[in-house]
C-alpha cells in the first residue's frame, strides 16, 4: 500500500498536556473523511466470530469502517474476508446478512465468485470476451491480513500493518477476560442469537472512548442500578465477586487501547449471583471455583469493559458481549453488538443469558438507552459555531502518579481520564502518520 498523505494537522485539536480535546474532531466532516484513509484503511478491525460460519459455504456480511465485507468459510475450511463488491460493475455480490452458498453471484451482470474469492462465472465469456478476460486477476478483493484470535476474526486492508498480536500488545490480557471460558480455559466462546444493530446520531469516538475507560459516568445509570437489573436481581449491575475488588483502569497510549477491570485483593469465595435459577447458579459457582483453581492469583483479575482501538469494545461481565461502532458520517454511527457464551455451557444457561442480554443491552435495553442519550445530545450540542470554540475537558488525573498493580498498562485505581487521553493520543498519531514505519 502506498504511503498515506495527511490532509490536515490535528495536533492543535488534541492538547493532551492540558487535557483539552476540540469538539471539531467529533463533528467535522473533513476530519471524518481523513479518518477513513488514515485510520480505517490501516488499522486492525473486528469482523466477526468463527462460530457464525461453522460450515463450508457459510457467510456473514459485516463491515470494516464504511465498507461492506463478507466473512466466509470456503470448501477447504479456510476463512476469508472479501470486499462486498463485484469487480465488474460494483454491485454488492451478497445482499443477505448471513447464509450458506457455493457461489456469490452479482445480480447486476451475473459474475460469480467462489467462496475462496475466485471469479468462476462470467456470462458470455466466449461470445463477448472471446475468452480473453484473465479471470485469475478479477477475483473478489481480499483483505491484506487476517487473524483468528480465540475465535474472533480481525482484518486489515494494510499489508504493512504490524501482525495482529503486536497490534494488540498487552491489551491481550484484558481482551481475554471476555473471550475465555468462565472456568478459566482459553477461548471456547461462541456467538448466541442474532446481532443487535441500530443507528445513533453521534460520532463513533463517543462510544469507543466510553468503553475504553469512562468510569465517571455511572450517575447516568443510577435508575438502572436501583431497579434490580443485575443477575442477582438485588439492585446492582455488578456480580457479587466484584463488590470487594479494586477497580483498575489500564491505558496503552502507544496503541490506543484501554480497559477497566476489577482486581481482587485476595482470593474471594463465590457468592450467589443467579439465585432465581438454581441450575444456572450451580453452573456459575462451578465455573468460578474452577477458574480460581486453574489460574491461581491470575483469577483475581475480573474483566469489565475495554476498547481495542479504534472501534471494537467489549463487556466482560454479563451480558458478555462485543460491540463495534461502525462510522457512518461525522454525526452518525451504526452500532453492532454480538453476545457471547461458553460454547459448552448447558442450554438452560444460554437461554437465561440470552434473555438477560435483551433486558440489559441495545436500543431497547435499559443501560444502552442511557449511554445513547448522552452521546447523541453531546453531538447535537457541539455542532454550533459558538460551541465549537470551546474544547472538552479531559483533565481528570492529569499529572498524578500511576501506581503499579502488577497488571499491564498505565494503571490507576482512581476514576481518571488517562485511558481517554491515550485513545486520542493514538488517534492523533494515526491521523498524521504517512505510514506504519513512522508509527513503529
Task: Report residues per predicted region.
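Basic/polar N-terminal segments that are highly enriched at the extreme N-terminus
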Residues: 1-12, 438-440
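Short, contiguous pre-domain boundary segments
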Residues: 8-23
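Glycine/alanine-rich phosphate-binding loops at beta-alpha junctions
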Residues: 24-25, 29-40, 44-64
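Generic structural signal for secondary-structure transition and capping sites
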Residues: 40-44, 91, 216
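Short Pro/Gly-enriched beta-strand edge/turn motifs at strand-loop
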Residues: 42-54, 124-130, 303-309
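Rieske [2Fe-2S] iron-sulfur-binding domain
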Residues: 53-159, 163-173
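C-terminal catalytic domain of Rieske-type non-heme iron oxygenases
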Residues: 144-147, 152-440
Amino acid at each position: 500500500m502506498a504511503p498515506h498523505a495527511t490532509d490536515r494537522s490535528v495536533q492543535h485539536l488534541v492538547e493532551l498536556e492540558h487535557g483539552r480535546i476540540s469538539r471539531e474532531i467529533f463533528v467535522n466532516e473533513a476530519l471524518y473523511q481523513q479518518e477513513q484513509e488514515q485510520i480505517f484503511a490501516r488499522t486492525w478491525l473486528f469482523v466477526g466470530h468463527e462460530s457464525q460460519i461453522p460450515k463450508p459455504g457459510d457467510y456473514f456480511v459485516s463491515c470494516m469502517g464504511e465498507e461492506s465485507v463478507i466473512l466466509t468459510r470456503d470448501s477447504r475450511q479456510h476463512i476469508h474476508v472479501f470486499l462486498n463488491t463485484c469487480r465488474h460493475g460494483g454491485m454488492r455480490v451478497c445482499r443477505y446478512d448471513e447464509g450458506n452458498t457455493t457461489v456469490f453471484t452479482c445480480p447486476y451482470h451475473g459474475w460469480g465468485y467462489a467462496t475462496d474469492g475466485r471469479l468462476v462465472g462470467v456470462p458470455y465469456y466466449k461470445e463477448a470476451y472471446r475468452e480473453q478476460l484473465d479471470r485469475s486477476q478479477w477475483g473478489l478483493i481480499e483483505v491484506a491480513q487476517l487473524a483468528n484470535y480465540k475465535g474472533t476474526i480481525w482484518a486489515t486492508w494494510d499489508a504493512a500493518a504490524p501482525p495482529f498480536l503486536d497490534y494488540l500488545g498487552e491489551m491481550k490480557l484484558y481482551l481475554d477476560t471476555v473471550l475465555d471460558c468462565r472456568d478459566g480455559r482459553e477461548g471456547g466462546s461462541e456467538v448466541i442469537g442474532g446481532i443487535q444493530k441500530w443507528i445513533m446520531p453521534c460520532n463513533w469516538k463517543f462510544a469507543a472512548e466510553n468503553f475504553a475507560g469512562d468510569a465517571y459516568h455511572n450517575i447516568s445509570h443510577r435508575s438502572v442500578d436501583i431497579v434490580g437489573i443485575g443477575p442477582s436481581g438485588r439492585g446492582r449491575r455488578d456480580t457479587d465477586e466484584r463488590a470487594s475488588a479494586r477497580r483498575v483502569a489500564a491505558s496503552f497510549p502507544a496503541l490506543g487501547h484501554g480497559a477497566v477491570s476489577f482486581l481482587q485483593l485476595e482470593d474471594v469465595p463465590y457468592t450467589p449471583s443467579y439465585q432465581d435459577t438454581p441450575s444456572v447458579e450451580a453452573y456459575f459457582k462451578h465455573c468460578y471455583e474452577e477458574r480460581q483453581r486453574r489460574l491461581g492469583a491470575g483469577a483475581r483479575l475480573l474483566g469489565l469493559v475495554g476498547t481495542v482501538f479504534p472501534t471494537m469494545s467489549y463487556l466482560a461481565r454479563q451480558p458478555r458481549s462485543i460491540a463495534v461502532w461502525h462510522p457512518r458520517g461525522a454525526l452518525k454511527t451504526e452500532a453492532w453488538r454480538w453476545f457471547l457464551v461458553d460454547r459448552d455451557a448447558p442450554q438452560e444457561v444460554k437461554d437465561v443469558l440470552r434473555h438477560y442480554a435483551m433486558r440489559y443491552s441495545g436500543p431497547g435495553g435499559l443501560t444502552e438507552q442511557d449511554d445513547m442519550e448522552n452521546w447523541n445530545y453531546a453531538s447535537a450540542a457541539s455542532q454550533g459555531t459558538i460551541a465549537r470554540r470551546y474544547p472538552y475537558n479531559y483533565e481528570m488525573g492529569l499529572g498524578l502518579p500511576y501506581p503499579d498493580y502488577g497488571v499491564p498498562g498505565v494503571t490507576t485505581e482512581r476514576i481518571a481520564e488517562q485511558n481517554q487521553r491515550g485513545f486520542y493520543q493514538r488517534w492523533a498519531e494515526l491521523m498524521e502518520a504517512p505510514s506504519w514505519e513512522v508509527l513503529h
